Swiss-Prot record:
One of its GO terms (biological process) is sporulation resulting in formation of a cellular spore. This is RNA polymerase sigma-E factor. Pfam families: Sigma70_r2, Sigma70_r4. A motif (Polymerase core binding) lies at residues 82-95. NCBIfam families: PRK05803.1, PRK08301.1, sigma70-ECF, spore_sigmaE. The gene is sigE. It comes from Clostridium acetobutylicum (strain ATCC 824 / DSM 792 / JCM 1419 / IAM 19013 / LMG 5710 / NBRC 13948 / NRRL B-527 / VKM B-1787 / 2291 / W). Belongs to the sigma-70 factor family. Residues 202-221 bind DNA.
Length: 235
């Protein structure tokens, strides 16, 4: 990993953005084009068979993907060079964890890892502060528990819904769900419509399971934390 990060640093120092093309600084040579399916299959097979030098080739040939995704976040106030650096870390993770037996293209898997890495970076470095307390009690539910603003507003657990959008993310999520017990699985299925019957609110799930909304909220936060931990193990 240290070798790859050193390689990344050298590559990024040589990259400049110009119009719609990417060039190495100090020359007129454009970055290499994306891999064709046959090229990718050949390189991945060599990597699987122990040729570690292939990693750097896969990274360099997918740098255009990093730049493309990084540019989508230009309006966040973070410099595009920083976004490219962070995104390339996601690409490195993708190359290191890519499983060709899943029948998913490296570019597809890599794009989600790149985007997730950038999103996590933006969340960690966000300077936006809420001007109201997320822990201000709003009400008392029927079993005497305080219902907090943080219980009903969307937080990082909304990323679970976003994780369902792509095929790669579906597989990651379904694998992580296997780590939950039956009640936890049921709550996630109901809240995020994984059974095809539509999403349920916390109150609806609470009524269906015969427990309070505040308890559902606490369970959901614990479940989301565990799912994110399991998914991060695979990235």
């Amino acid at each position: 990993m240290k070798f790859l990060l050193r390689l990344l640093s050298k590559l990024l120092c040589r990259i400049k953005l110009f119009s719609n093309r990417l060039y190495y600084i100090g020359g007129n040579d454009a970055l290499p084009p994306p891999l064709s399916k046959d090229e990718e299959d050949d390189l991945v097979n060599k990597l699987v068979n122990g040729d570690e030098s292939i990693r750097s080739i896969l990274i360099e040939r997918n740098l255009r993907l990093v730049v493309y995704i990084a540019r989508k976040f230009e309006n966040t106030g973070v410099g595009v060079e920083d976004l490219i650096s962070v995104g390339t870390i996601g690409l490195i993770k993708a190359v290191n964890t890519f499983d060709p037996t899943k029948k998913i293209k490296l570019a597809t898997y890599g794009s989600r890892c790149i985007e997730n890495e950038i999103l996590m970076y933006l969340r960690r470095n966000s300077k936006v502060k809420a001007e109201i307390s997320f822990y201000e009690p709003l009400n008392i539910d029927w079993d005497g528990n305080k219902l907090l603003l943080s219980d009903i507003l969307g937080t990082d657990n909304d990323c679970v819904y976003n994780l369902i959008e792509g095929e790669v993310d579906k597989q990651l999520l379904l694998f992580a769900l296997k780590k939950l017990n039956e009640r936890e699985k049921r709550i996630v299925e109901l809240r995020y419509g994984l059974t095809g019957v539509g999403e349920k609110t916390q109150k609806e799930v609470a009524d269906m399971l015969g427990i309070s909304q505040s308890y559902i909220s606490r369970l959901e936060k614990r479940i989301i934390k565990r799912l994110k931990k399991e998914i991060n193990k695979m990235l």
